[in-house]
């Protein structure tokens, strides 16, 4: 139609490829073609494409038919990526252009640079042929150093004015999520005790930093030992920097209950901490509390996923692993709160 709106309302979550190409072309100021779906992210539609100069790019589009809010707010992601280009030694894709659309029917989108490489999460991926162990371990060290570099700059210094989420608010968020899920009696008891201990021992906050929300090797494009770009910023926020560090350590923990390759070569959690502290130049206080919080958080996120899978009659082997992991994560959180 002349005003750029689709002639018919789109199906929810289904984008019109010709519309995406047209608006991506307008956003970057040169023709974009060869649009193809690209795995990555869970909250938006992601495509690979090529400019007329043969340069590969990525187009992220909010789901059509839904308000572009929270983790569907792709323009918010673009603003964060643009701000983070000012942080030395933090590799993120470059934003090449945006289009605000007319949501919800014409969804917002942005175009960013394409980062070559692989996203490999050592202890949560089953591969017949793994990358060389030395390369994977160096990727872990690079991820810890890059996280320390990110934390050298406060969110306010980057021009990000969003309100910081406090550790207490994090506890309350995941407590509310768990309250909607049916837990076995032992798990329910562990949840109650864990929540009480987390609330009773709230740590003194640090300067708010930009948080990725899922900082791990599986969200990084790597070539050899080098991290080319940290991707999938849908759930970024501003909060206590120890959250992302604790999450990185959790994903490297060989005792993680849903780890499918616990013996895969990777930096151990304490090695990641040592690299981070060396890079930041100071010890990390009260990290045990955050180690407990991220396990409580993942127990809540897993319980929600299990609940929804059961409701949709889509229980898979992966879902069963998560169901089994919920009480184990809560028990592991309690262990870290009682040391």
What are these regions (language model features)?
Residues 162-165, 282-294:
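All-alpha amphipathic helical-bundle segments outside canonical DNA-binding/catalytic cores
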Residues 243-281, 294-312:
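Active-site activation/catalytic loop segments of kinase-like enzymes and analogous catalytic loops
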């Amino acid at each position: 139609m002349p005003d750029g709106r689709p002639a018919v309302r789109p199906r929810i979550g289904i984008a019109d490829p010709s519309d995406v190409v047209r608006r991506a072309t307008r956003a970057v100021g040169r023709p974009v073609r060869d649009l193809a779906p690209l795995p990555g992210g869970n909250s938006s539609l992601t495509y690979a494409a090529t400019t007329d100069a043969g340069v590969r790019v990525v187009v992220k589009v909010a789901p059509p038919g839904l308000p572009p809010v929270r983790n569907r707010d792709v323009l918010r992601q673009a603003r964060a990526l643009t701000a983070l280009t000012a942080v030395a030694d933090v590799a993120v894709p470059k934003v090449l252009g945006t289009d605000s659309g007319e949501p919800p029917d014409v969804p917002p989108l942005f175009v960013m640079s394409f980062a070559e490489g692989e996203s490999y999460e050592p202890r949560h991926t089953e591969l017949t042929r793994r990358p060389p162990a030395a390369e994977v371990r160096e990727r872990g060290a690079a991820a810890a150093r890059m996280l320390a570099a990110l934390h050298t700059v406060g969110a306010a210094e980057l021009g990000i004015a969003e309100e910081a989420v406090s550790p207490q608010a994090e506890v309350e968020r995941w407590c509310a999520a768990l309250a909607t899920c049916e837990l076995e009696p032992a798990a329910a008891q562990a949840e109650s005790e864990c929540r009480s201990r987390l609330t009773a021992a709230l740590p003194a906050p640090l300067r708010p930093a930009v948080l990725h929300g899922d900082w791990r090797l599986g969200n990084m494009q790597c070539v050899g030992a080098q991290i080319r770009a940290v991707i999938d910023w849908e759930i970024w926020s501003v909060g206590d920097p120890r959250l992302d560090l604790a999450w990185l350590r959790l994903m490297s923990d060989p005792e993680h209950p849903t780890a499918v390759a616990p013996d895969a070569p990777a930096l151990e959690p304490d090695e990641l901490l040592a690299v981070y502290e060396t890079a930041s130049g100071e010890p990390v206080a009260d990290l045990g509390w955050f180690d407990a919080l991220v396990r409580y958080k993942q127990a809540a996120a897993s319980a929600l996923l299990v609940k929804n899978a059961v409701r949709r009659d889509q229980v898979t082997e992966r879902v069963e692993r998560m169901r089994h992991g919920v009480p184990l994560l809560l028990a592991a959180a309690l262990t870290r709160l009682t040391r």
